[in-house]
Amino acid sequence: MFKYYDRVLHLPEDKLIDIVNKLPQIKEQGFTSILTSVLQPSKEEWNVAWHMRYQVNSIYGKDIGNLMGSKDDLKLLCNKAHEIGLSVYVDVVFTHFGNKGGIGLNELTPHESVDEVLRNNPYYWKNKNRINYNDRYSITHDCNNLATLRLDNFDLQDIIIDLVNTYIDLGVDGIRIDSCKLISCPHEYFQNEYRNMFFERFKQGLKKDIVLFGEVINENKEIIELYQNDADIDVLSNISYDLYNVDKNKVYSFYESHDTFLNEGCMGYTKRLTTDEVIKNYGYACKDFPKTVFYNRAKTDMWKREDVRLINNTYKR
């Protein structure tokens, strides 16, 4: 599904049932869609460590549901959102699994809570080497400090198609593909390899056309356009010079995300900014891009501010 205009409110710390109660005000604030947290189970509870929700231990549709809510909660949220014209997107993780922990190869090995059929199949897992982010082959073939899946495998593709079709059955309108840049594109050729048909088979296998935006952050124009044109999906990416030089109609832009705010060190580069500064820059993004994502900082009501409402309504398209 292609949307020309979309103002997405990202509420990763909110339980689904709590979002239901906020829907009327979300609509009043000028948002058109909601992005929820990851709803797959993880290798351990993550009340404290936010990043643990991305260390999932299942990509099966039957297992959807975690601390943020159940399948029934998600179905209720979708139904209530649709009644007032809002869309619901879910953050979905299927490029990697939670690891065994520790250091060395354990960091790149699936956790023992991962289904043994998946865990014990050597054809499902990428090389146990850490990614060199300056090397495209390494990005698509090695591990991002977690146990990383080979999505050129047809069996895995079928499992992921079923996962997303389960979300579609529950009423979801789109998904954010976490760590999408780890997946090679259809016509991205590497020596002595068959091309990866993931995106083609994935989209063909879905029950209906939905919004697909893949996380492709800190990348150059060439890679962003590769996903826009070859994979034929929208790209979720941070504001950058390169983002201004690609097709803006196939971009979901953001100034701040959970990564830039919650990570330590240089990755958490918006942590030092005030909410006023973040909202001001969100306004610049809305002025320049028809599709944007507003991340609501944990334990705040930033999204409820009057200046956010004014920005959304001023740059409505």
What residues fall within each predicted segment?
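Substrate-binding/active-site clefts of carbohydrate-active enzymes
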Residues: F2-N21, Q29-L170, C185-K207, V211-G214, ...
